[in-house]
């Protein structure tokens, strides 16, 4: 058992050194690592060593290598899977040393040989070329390798292709068989995959120490890798296209997730059985909490109908604006030395507390006072906003009253100044304004009497001349007749002035009357009120005087 533990530790050390230092070649590793590899090779049974040349043996070795590489982190394996295209060319040649790659899934090399190099399936043989090995091997080494002659690569490649498509049932059965060994509790996650490694490392044979064993392991590992990939040692693999790379990465990720789930399934079963003991106490505590919360909720449901009634009363009390206004008026009437709003706020809060304390118990009132909830804060904020609005309204009313009083005083001062301007200089006593007012009233009465007298005179004049329109029509008719007479005289070639002079000699009184008839229309439209009846005889005399004159002139 101690020897198996030593071999297992050596196997873990080999995996860690190969995954931690990918830049070094296997030939440049420390002798301890080579010794560990030799122990691993020597620990395999003889039946497996005989079957190394066939495809099944290579697949079994590939499974062992994939299990050992399964301990590496998943992130590092994905990064190496993405960068594995640039590192896979120079491993087959001994001239250019390169780092060995760790497979990201069990059949990675077979998948690469199938996708990248199509010639691997159609070549007649991909046997290792004799004499191409870099280091000459002794007779013992050749004798040891003669037992393991490799078969042609064509059936190996076909077996790889068919093995990649078979389901994971065989791998699951192997992992379940390997995980039957007991895992001691308290070990880290890096040791979860150790039973699967132990199942493949158990063998009845023991390693025989010889000086040629470190040299044998290196070419043998290279030959196995070349046989697995199905490549000729002299040629380099071709890089696949981008679509093939993406398909390969997706397939590798799916295979890795399936492997991780299979490896962790037994450990999860054990951890779930261990957690059951812990969860039992937690479930009991949660059940007690649920019962307590249900009891509290039932008690609150019983108290809810008791709380709804006082809430309705609360909305009637503190929000009644009339009561608040009456309280405010009482505080204002008490005097300006008090602060009414502070006392009103205290009274409202006291009324709220008294109403809440009546329906609720003393304990709940104490809790409510010590632990105010969100509703309490909202109610307080609403009360403060209401009182603030009332204060603002009262201030506005006070300001308006002050402005109104100031306006009244200003108007009174203006009236006093106007009265003082009309008052005599000698009268500056207290009765001067009254005397000035009486004087103004007397003057107003006098002006009213004069206006009434003027209106009466106008009324008398209108009533004394009821035919004024007829008189105006008669004056217009006389003017038209005179104009027509002048036109007739001018048409006959008679001089109106000479004719009027001759007529005036006969009647001296008719000349001034005839001269008045030649006045303007405006002068005749303004008859004097003193002698209205003189107009008619004047017109009649003029007509009588003008009528015979043309007859007398035209008769000879």
Curated annotation (Swiss-Prot):
Q: State a GO cellular component annotated for this protein.
A: photoreceptor connecting cilium
Q: List the disulfide bonds.
A: none
Write out the biased-composition intervals (Basic residues): 75-85, 266-278
Q: Where is this region: Disordered?
A: 1-102, 180-320, 503-556
Q: Show the ranges annotated as biased composition (Basic and acidic residues).
A: 304-320
Q: Bias category Acidic residues: which stretches?
A: 213-225, 246-260
Q: Where is the composition biased (Polar residues)?
A: 1-20, 527-543
Q: Which residues form a coiled coil?
A: 387-463
- Record's keyword terms, sorted: Coiled coil
Q: What does the record list as GO biological process?
A: cilium organization
- Keyword Coiled coil carried by entry: yes
Q: List the protein's name.
A: Testis-specific protein 10-interacting protein
Q: Which gene encodes it?
A: TSGA10IP
């Amino acid at each position: 058992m101690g020897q198996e533990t030593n071999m297992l530790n050596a196997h873990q050390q080999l995996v860690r050194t190969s995954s931690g230092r990918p830049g070094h070649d296997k030939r440049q590793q420390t002798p301890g690592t080579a010794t560990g590899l030799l122990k691993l090779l020597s620990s395999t049974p003889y039946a497996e060593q005989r079957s190394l040349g066939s495809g099944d043996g290579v697949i079994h070795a590939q499974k062992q290598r994939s299990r050992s590489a399964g301990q590496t982190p998943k992130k590092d394996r994905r990064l190496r899977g993405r960068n594995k295209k640039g590192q896979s060319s120079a491993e087959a040649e001994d001239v250019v040393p390169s780092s060995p790659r760790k497979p990201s899934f069990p059949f990675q090399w077979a998948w690469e040989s199938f996708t990248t190099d199509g010639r691997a399936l159609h070549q007649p043989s991909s046997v290792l070329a004799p004499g191409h090995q870099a280091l000459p091997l002794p007779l013992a080494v050749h004798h040891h390798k003669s037992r393991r002659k490799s078969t042609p690569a064509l059936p190996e490649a076909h077996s790889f292709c068919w093995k990649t498509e078979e389901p994971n049932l065989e791998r699951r059965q192997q992992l379940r068989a390997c995980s039957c060994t007991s895992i001691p509790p308290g070990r880290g996650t890096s040791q979860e995959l150790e039973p699967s490694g132990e199942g493949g490392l158990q063998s009845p044979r023991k390693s025989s120490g010889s000086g040629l064993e470190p040299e044998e392991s290196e070419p043998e590992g290279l030959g196995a890798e070349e046989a697995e990939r199905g490549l000729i040692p002299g040629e380099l693999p071709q890089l696949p296209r981008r679509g093939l790379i993406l398909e390969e990465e997706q397939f590798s990720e799916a295979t890795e997730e399936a492997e991780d789930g299979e490896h962790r399934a037994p450990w999860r079963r054990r951890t779930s059985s261990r957690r059951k003991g812990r969860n039992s106490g937690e479930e009991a505590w949660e059940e007690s909490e649920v019962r307590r919360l249900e009891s509290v909720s039932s008690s609150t449901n019983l108290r809810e109908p008791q709380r709804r009634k006082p809430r309705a009363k609360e909305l009637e009390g503190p929000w009644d604006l009339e009561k608040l206004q009456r309280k405010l008026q009482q505080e204002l009437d008490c005097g300006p030395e008090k602060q009414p709003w502070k006392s009103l706020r205290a009274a409202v809060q006291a009324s709220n507390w008294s109403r809440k304390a009546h329906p609720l118990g003393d304990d709940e009132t104490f809790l409510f006072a010590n632990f105010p909830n969100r509703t309490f804060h909202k109610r307080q904020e609403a009360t403060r906003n209401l009182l603030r609005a009332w204060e603002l309204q009262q201030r506005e009313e006070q300001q308006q009253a002050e402005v109104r009083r100031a306006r009244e005083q200003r108007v009174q001062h203006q009236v006093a100044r106007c009265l003082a301007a009309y008052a005599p200089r000698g009268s500056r006593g207290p009765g001067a304004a009254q005397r000035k007012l009486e004087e103004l009233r007397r003057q107003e009465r006098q002006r009213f009497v004069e206006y009434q007298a003027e209106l009466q005179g106008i009324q008398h004049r209108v009533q004394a001349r009821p035919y004024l329109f007829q008189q105006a029509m008669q004056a217009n008719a006389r003017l038209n007749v005179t104009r027509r007479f002048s036109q007739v005289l001018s048409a006959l070639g008679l001089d109106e002035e000479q004719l009027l002079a001759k007529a005036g000699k006969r009647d001296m009184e008719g000349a001034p009357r005839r001269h008045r008839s030649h006045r303007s229309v405006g002068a005749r439209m303004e008859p004097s009120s003193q002698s209205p009846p003189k107009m008619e005889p004047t017109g009649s005399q003029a007509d009588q005087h003008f009528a015979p004159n043309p007859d007398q002139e035209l008769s000879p």
